[in-house]
Amino acid sequence: PTTAINTVIRSLNLEPGFEVLSSDHEYGSLIRAWEWFSKEKGYFFVQKNLPIPMTSHQDFVDNFWEGVTTKTKIIFLSHITSSTGLIFPIEEICKRARSEGIITIIDGAHVPGHIKLNIETINPDIYTGACHKWLSAPKGSTFLYVQRELQEFISPLIVSWGNDVDPSPIQFINENQYQGTRD
């Protein structure tokens, strides 16, 4: 998911002054990526303190939503946190964000093979998951899901095969499915 999230972050066209809201439970390398690009592009990466324990999903949603402002354009959260194994109520967050026009980017690194995953039910704008953790796939096996209406805004991190002519009818897949030889 690190590569997938970096691909997404690099593609964002947030205006200076806008905010990405996250939590203080996120994975370190992705926090660093958000901080790097927010400084480079002039938007703010805000980490909401989420004290634990919380008593319900609604308690979590209400606490997290206190961090949303009129400048919040993106919410970035883990589905299952790396450090504590907490399962965040992502479906509820995504539903509320969608109703308010906020894009959701979900780091599901620890989800595939660990708990049930139904992206259609969760309905995030962007979701990524690691297949090498609980599915025992080769290291680096990851997927990136992007809602169709946002795919045209996601540029490949590495340009290689597929960026010009490929048999897939979906340009997003052409540009991102194969990133060349790793050497």
Question: Where are the model-predicted features located?
Answer:
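A short glycine-threonine-serine/GTX helix/turn-capping micro-motif
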Residues: P169-D183
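Short beta-strand elements in bilobed, periplasmic/extracellular small-molecule ligand-binding domains
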Residues: K41-P51
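Conserved beta-loop-alpha segment that forms the PLP phosphate-binding cup at the N-terminus of a helix
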Residues: P1-G17, G28-I31
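Active-site PLP attachment segment
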Residues: I122-I170
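Active-site phosphate-binding strand-loop segment of PLP-dependent enzymes
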Residues: F44, T55-A109, G113, W134
